[in-house]
């Protein structure tokens, strides 16, 4: 027999654990989770609205963040700061025992200030500095009230790089965003993650940004979908394999939310099934794993919200320690997917694009107009040279011929150049038009600027261009397309 010396290296473990959090929002969510968990576990002690105040201050190369709550304070620091110390877990929000330590390992520097009711009576508070360590890890007992935290309560202060802070921006934005835009994204992220918690007034969260002499503080509002059609199921009790849980579910078709940067945009990444546990989102954008097929673009406005309520962690599908998804292969997760398949109607595919349906509605209206002689969708252009180009809509009336280039939502300046090509193609084919219309839900300022410039020019035959922009609403076509 011989000894194996395998004492863990604390620096190596901390570096390994820190890689689990790649997003600034994961760090913030972990700290907010801990505060909410504390409130829920001790709600009988609170005679006030639980509050979480988040302050983000911009510096040259870093941001400094304070996450401050008015909970009970950390009563068992040994357990709270033990990696995998789930024995101190107060609710299912901190079941793993990794979250706080992972969050602290993912930032540049950190400090915890905490004060319990007992500390208040003794006129003291506690302070713990990073870096995290398994040996000779010490805290400081300080006299007086803590200026940086509620008493009782807990504050976590940390700094991180601006590169980490930039991870708040939506994935489709490649350029760096400014500080105030990132603050707005942070509010949206929190409002989405804790939407049902905030809507039920279980807690109030505020985010304050500070940059130089400028400050802006706002309470986080719940980010909720706007339903066009919705089916709400009654609350049901079911056993996923670890005990009975309550399931609330609603699903249907949502209206795209233009004011949001990321959520409920009715696109591929913000549609599908959204699963929450006790009001906190765990995973979203689920479709192919449930129905075993890729979603079709026509299903982008489909949303299903499934909220599981339980105080028993063992009754739930197993989550990642970062709580940003469920672990694949878990039997309780498969049972949940089966419940969803049985109780939620999978959205039907529509192989026609939204643009095609809108143009079809417009064409139907044009056919009813007096003096209209011919209405054609997918009209050929440059046919005289064998081109297969197609114009969205061609309308010939007694007085003039008009062509349409259609976009469902927003146009771009280059769409006008496409329309110009179609105008020239019609002239080449011997069927010159009198007006070319760009139609969409909305048009940015760049389109109007280019419109004026192009309308001052002439086509190759010497005829002046006549371009016009309009909206679906102005033409009496509703979004989403309904041809009633």
What does each of the following model-derived ranges do?
Residues 1-51, 77-79, 317-323, 330-338:
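Bergerat-fold GHKL ATPase/HATPase_c domain
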Residues 90-209:
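GHKL-type ATPase core
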Residues 232-369, 373-376:
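Charged regulatory segments coupled to nucleotide-binding catalytic modules in large multidomain enzymes
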Residues 288, 370-399, 410-411, 476-479:
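Active-site metal-binding core of divalent-cation-utilizing nuclease and nuclease-like domains
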Residues 461-484:
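Non-catalytic C-terminal interaction segments of nucleic acid-processing enzymes
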Residues 112-123, 407-408, 424-460, 471-474:
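Nucleic-acid nuclease catalytic cores
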Residues 75-78, 284-286, 410-420, 446-449:
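Active-site-adjacent loop/helix micro-motif of nuclease/hydrolase catalytic cores
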Residues 36-91, 132-133:
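Conserved beta-strand-loop-beta-strand hairpin that lines the nucleotide-binding pocket
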């Amino acid at each position: 027999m011989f000894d194996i010396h395998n004492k863990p290296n604390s620096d190596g473990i901390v570096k390994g654990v820190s890689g689990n959090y790649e997003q600034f929002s994961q760090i913030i969510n972990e700290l907010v989770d801990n505060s909410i968990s504390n409130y829920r576990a001790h709600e009988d002690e609170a005679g006030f609205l639980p509050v979480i105040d988040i302050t983000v201050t911009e510096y040259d190369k870093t941001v400094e963040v304070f996450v401050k709550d008015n909970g009970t304070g950390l009563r068992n620091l040994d357990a709270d700061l033990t990696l995998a110390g789930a024995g101190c877990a107060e609710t299912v929000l901190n079941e793993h025992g990794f979250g706080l330590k992972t969050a602290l390992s993912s930032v540049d520097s950190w400090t915890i200030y905490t004060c319990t009711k007992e500390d208040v009576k003794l006129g003291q508070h506690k302070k713990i500095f990073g870096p995290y360590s398994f040996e000779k890890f010490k805290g400081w007992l300080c006299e007086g009230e803590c200026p940086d935290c509620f008493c009782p309560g807990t504050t976590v202060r940390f700094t991180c790089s601006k590169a980490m802070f930039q991870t708040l921006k939506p994935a489709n934005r490649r350029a760096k965003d400014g500080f105030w835009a990132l603050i707005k994204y942070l509010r949206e992220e929190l409002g989405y993650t804790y939407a049902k918690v905030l809507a039920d007034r279980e807690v109030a969260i505020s985010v304050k940004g500070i940059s130089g002499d400028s400050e802006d503080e706002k309470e986080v509002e719940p980010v909720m979908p706007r339903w066009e059609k919705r089916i709400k199921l009654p609350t049901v009790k079911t056993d996923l394999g670890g005990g009975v849980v309550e399931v609330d579910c609603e699903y249907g078709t949502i209206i795209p939310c233009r004011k949001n940067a990321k959520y409920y945009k009715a696109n591929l990444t913000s549609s599908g099934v959204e699963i929450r546990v006790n009001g906190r989102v765990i995973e979203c954008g689920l479709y192919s794993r449930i129905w075993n097929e890729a979603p079709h673009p026509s299903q982008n406005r489909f949303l299903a919200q499934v909220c599981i309520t339980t105080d028993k962690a063992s009754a739930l599908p197993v989550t990642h320690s970062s709580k940003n998804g469920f672990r694949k292969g878990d039997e309780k997760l498969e049972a949940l997917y089966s419940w969803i398949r049985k109780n939620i109607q999978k959205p039907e595919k529509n192989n026609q694009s939204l643009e095609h349906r809108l143009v079809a509605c417009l064409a139907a209206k044009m056919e009813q107009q007096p003096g209209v002689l011919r209405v054609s969708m997918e009209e050929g252009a440059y046919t005289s040279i064998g081109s297969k180009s197609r114009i969205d809509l061609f309308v010939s009336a007694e007085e003039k011929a008009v062509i349409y280039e259609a976009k469902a939502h927003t146009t771009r300046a280059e769409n006008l150049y496409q329309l110009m090509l179609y105008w020239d193609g019609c002239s080449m084919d011997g069927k010159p038009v009198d007006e070319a219309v760009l139609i969409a839900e909305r048009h940015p300022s760049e389109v109007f600027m280019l419109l004026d410039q192009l309308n001052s020019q002439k086509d190759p035959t010497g005829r002046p261009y006549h371009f016009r922009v309009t909206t679906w609403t102005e033409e009496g076509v509703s979004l989403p397309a309904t041809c009633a």
